[in-house]
Amino acid sequence: MKVYAAPFEKFVNLADARLGTRILSVTDDWFADANRLFQPTPAVWKEGVFDDNGKWMDGWESRRKRFEGYDSAVIRLGVAGTIKGVDIDTSFFTGNFPPSASLEACFLASGEPDENTAWTEVLPSVELQGNSHHYHEINNDQAFSHLRFNIYPDGGVARLRVYGVPHRDWSKVSADEQIDLVAALNGGRSIACSDEHYGSMSNILNPGRGVNMGDGWETARRRTPGNDWVIVALGHKGEVEKVIVDTLHFKGNYPDSCSIQGALVKGGTDSQIETQSLFWRELLPSQKLTMHAEHEFAEQIKAIGPITHIRLNVFPDGGVSRLRVLGKVAR
């Protein structure tokens, strides 16, 4: 099992480039493009690589400041949401990292921030070290759509991860509209799995199809009896009508078969839910899978009523690129 550096790492990274997160404005990114902050892959070091502005760095890096002030970047999150925690990652920035940083946020139903926008401080100034991860829990139940990331006074940051719960106005979803109940953009999140040796369990809920094997969930080769599994919390309680299991890019390492269980969970912690999931009702009986393909199951879905969680079982192990659970919202 993967060991998380902070409990909130299991939540959706709202600042993931794959969700559409992007820089709206930045005071200075002379040495390194600020949009690199949102790349889903870990930062890398390229020895001896320089461009016209200096040493190539995998992150956001501003010039050395020769006047008063500090640098900042205004960010539009790919999906608005409630922030549970952040990771300010200064990997490979050693003599050029900012001594401190802070984070502000706002929520706009439409449009972009301007000079009249009221910002809320969600992370007061915190000290930073070079080549390090800095995990900070955020205690604020508001939903935010934009961030202002401040570094004092200048320097470089490799990655900014903003973990939280995506926000969606479910009152605007009609009773007869079929939606993906587990999509990250709709608030779905992977909460536990048996193993994620090669790829994160959260990848299977991302929009679009996977770009490669690394952009999916893949377990280690199982050398003991049993099977691998992942538990997903739906963005909203709903009734399932169709499931899509996509093994794109997985050719010699796709699962032989899969099944899905579901449950209407009321209360409990993630660890308690994990323990109980073995006894959930069968939503999708065991189905054969093939390599590098989308598998749609509709007629095979059992009518078990409204559910809040599903458990995808893969037999015996292997990789899945994406999981879609289509259905209607249950009020």
From Swiss-Prot:
The keyword Lyase does not apply. Keywords: Hydrolase, Purine metabolism. Its EC number is 3.5.3.4. GO terms for molecular function: allantoicase activity. It comes from the Bacteria. The keyword Zinc does not apply. Disulfide bonds: none annotated. GO terms for biological process: allantoin catabolic process; purine nucleobase metabolic process. Pathway: Nitrogen metabolism; (S)-allantoin degradation; (S)-ureidoglycolate from allantoate (aminidohydrolase route): step 1/1. It catalyses: allantoate + H2O = (S)-ureidoglycolate + urea. PANTHER family: ALLANTOICASE, INACTIVE ALLANTOICASE-RELATED. HAMAP family: Allantoicase. Belongs to the allantoicase family. This is Probable allantoicase. The gene is alc.
